[in-house]
A protein has these predicted regions:
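A short acidic, Gly/Pro-enriched loop at the edge of an enzyme's catalytic core
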Residues: 223-234
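Conserved SAM-binding loop of SAM-dependent methyltransferases across substrates and taxa
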Residues: 49-59
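Conserved SAM-binding motif I beta-strand of class I
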Residues: 63-67
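Core SAM-dependent methyltransferase catalytic element
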Residues: 280-310
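Conserved beta-strand signature within the Rossmann-like core of class I S-adenosyl-L-methionine
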Residues: 261-270
Length: 310
């Protein structure tokens, strides 16, 4: 097994075994649906709460969903079979943040946010964001909770705290504005999850009981797969937390398991480097600093891989 902090099944400090980390997913699977080969393709994804696996399966793909956390995988199985969503560690953090904002800031109370979330004009959304939501009170609250040494950094395990941008209070506000300036709120289920912790009205429940679920380290699963056995992999943010050794193992495993010409999708919470943010602005979830899409070439050293830009 490769070395990754995801093995613990925890993102928050404390004692005990694996916990449920994600009750819902915060990744816009519209990215994957737009770049993956035509269905039916053989796709491996991270199971998490099951949303991406369900969307890919419903689009006609042959989906294998992998998770190293047995608690998370059991939850994904239940949810994909029609079970209800429940709160994981990520939702607990978000609920506490929303509660503080709603108590201190009138614009962040649920009734006011409900009106904001029904808007369908990005230009108006930006005006409302700047005028009603992104004020001095929010900036003070985010500065207290999201900067280095703040509440979020103290709650997270060190491996995960290390990937949070140094000025995440400013970075997160910028990512939120980028999202509302580009995507209609009324058609953005991920913004509803972030702002009010609920599905938007009329949302279709997750349901894909035929998704193949595998418990294990994604590197091990890819290494055991037939060479070129997948047309695409979408790996969430599995590189957020582990060190360079894990990244190297994952790179080699992907090259083994994905055919030349196949697609790889990776996300990261980090701020983008010189290579840019990729598809992050197109991801309606608002969380990601980088969303990278790559088409694998035939050369084992990666020299003819091709980055796919929006």
């Amino acid at each position: 097994m490769s070395i990754t902090p995801w093995t613990r099944g925890r993102i928050l400090g404390g004692f005990g075994g694996p916990r449920l980390l994600f009750g819902r997913m915060y990744e816009d699977h519209g990215i994957e649906l737009g770049v993956l080969p035509a269905s039916p393709s053989r796709v491996l994804c991270i199971a998490s709460a099951g949303d991406t696996a369900a969307a890919l399966h419903q689009a006609g793909h042959d989906v294998t969903a992998v998770d190293i956390n047995p608690v998370q995988l059991a939850y994904a199985r239940t949810r994909l079979s029609g079970g209800a969503s429940v709160e994981g560690a990520a939702e607990t953090l978000m609920r506490l943040g929303r509660g503080a904002a709603g108590t201190l800031l009138p614009g962040w109370r649920e009734d006011a946010l409900g009106a904001f979330l029904t808007l369908d004009d990005p230009a108006r959304q930006v005006r409302c964001w700047r005028g009603d939501l992104d004020g001095p009170g929010l900036r003070r609250l985010m500065r207290w909770s999201l900067r280095p040494g703040g509440a979020l950094a103290m709650a997270l395990l060190p491996s995960f705290a290390s990937v949070v941008p140094a000025r995440f209070d400013e970075v997160f506000r910028q990512r939120l504005e980028r999202t509302v300036a580009r995507h209609p709120n009324v058609r953005n289920p991920w913004l509803w999850r972030l702002f009010v912790g609920a599905e938007q009205p009329g949302a279709v429940p997750v349901h894909a009981p035929d998704v193949r679920l595998v418990q294990g380290d994604v590197v091990d699963v890819l290494e055991r797969a037939p060479r070129g056995g997948y047309d695409a992999v979408t790996l969430s943010n599995v590189l957020d937390g582990p060190g360079p050794a894990f990244a190297g193992q994952l790179r080699a495993a992907v090259r083994h398991a994905v055919r030349p010409g196949g697609i790889v999708v990776l996300r990261s919470f980090r701020e983008p480097g010189p290579a840019g943010a990729g598809w992050a602005a197109q991801d309606r979830s608002a969380l990601w600093g980088v969303v990278r899409v790559v088409r694998l070439g035939a050369n084992p050293d990666g020299t003819n891989d091709r980055r796919i830009d929006p």
